[in-house]
Amino acid sequence: MPICEFSATSKSRKIDVHAHVLPKNIPDFQEKFGYPGFVRLDHKEDGTTHMVKDGKLFRVVEPNCFDTETRIADMNRANVNVQCLSTVPVMFSYWAKPADTEIVARFVNDDLLAECQKFPDRLVPLGTLPMNDVQRAVEIFGKRIFFFEIWSPAKKSPEEVKRCVSMGIKGFEVGSHVAEKSLDHRDFWPLYKLTESFKLSTIMPGFCEFFENWGLTTKTPGICEELSVVLFVHPWDMHMWDGRLDKYWMPWLVGMPSETAQAICSVLMGNILVLFPKLKLCFAHGGGAYPQIRGRVSHGWNVRPDLCAGKCKVAPNKLDGLLWTDSLVHDPKALELLINTVGKEHIVLGTDYPFPLGELEVGRVVEEYKPFSAKDREDLLWKNAVKMLDIDENLLFNKDF
């Protein structure tokens, strides 16, 4: 019997932006790199598969997590036209050596692209990046040579930077943090937008200032804004809080919403959406706990600006309308709060397929939300995703149910 079964609530068009996938055959990275912490798959005779980490069972998954034909059958049964596929966060491997994380990321992305090409009108890939070394992350798109981009008329072609996107990747899933670094950390700025040529300013202090004084730029086009690439932020590596989350499935029920709220607050109060207003950040699980604590965060920003408003002079509640989230909140009242936080124009359907904590009746909360008009439902079920991902809807929806 399946761990969980996804079903349909209607025949409405649907684009699910939050669906996970694993490669069917994962190399033994522990053996390859010579240290533990990596996941491998152990396929069992009963049809289940064990995700194994350091010799211990991490999670049981079924073929719909790695077999594309099984996935498509589930999508047909649940009347899902399109899924946006992203890896399971345990595959991020941000804790590993950066060169090794890059190898894992490239393997995951190559497998993801290959599987999506089997059903290009049904599956949209969202890749992964070695976020523990953002320079490597940028080079996943294509190498950029910061030094020559300052003055060379024959600077590197943007087409090379667009290599990965031209292969079909519409965005990247990133973790809610990387070790001690939240998403406002300056190390991530090269991935966000027009950022200072940090390589030069680090190697040769004052060099960039010298050129800028002469009216020459040391700024490089930012990858994600330039290419209209979405960063899908997923909570991961939830802290165990001295063991208090060890039982009752607390890391997933409490840890994940808290982790996502912390990531959103870092982005808002870290000035990221002021510096990079075109950046598309979509947060999983309806933004986690952020809609519930939004008023508290804004109040704290007002009464303790010395602690909260150091980098950003714009109140958080004036910026959260720039955020995107998925719709995975499980409750109509929670959806209403989310709408009042980010706006119904910035919410996209998400299920967390194929895991049991997802929305098993796909689109149920959206379709049963009584204040919605037919247009509102259509927007949340698929049209907002088309806008966020910047995809041609004419290339999709070749499957009628």
Swiss-Prot record:
Pfam families: Amidohydro_2
Reaction catalysed by this enzyme: 2-amino-3-carboxymuconate 6-semialdehyde + H(+) = 2-aminomuconate 6-semialdehyde + CO2
Gene Ontology CC terms: cytoplasm; cytosol
Enzyme class, spelled out: lyase
Pathway: Secondary metabolite metabolism; quinolate metabolism
Subunit structure: Monomer.
Role according to the record: Converts alpha-amino-beta-carboxymuconate-epsilon-semialdehyde (ACMS) to alpha-aminomuconate semialdehyde (AMS).
Protein name (database record): 2-amino-3-carboxymuconate-6-semialdehyde decarboxylase
Species: Caenorhabditis elegans
Lineage: Eukaryota, Metazoa, Ecdysozoa, Nematoda, Chromadorea
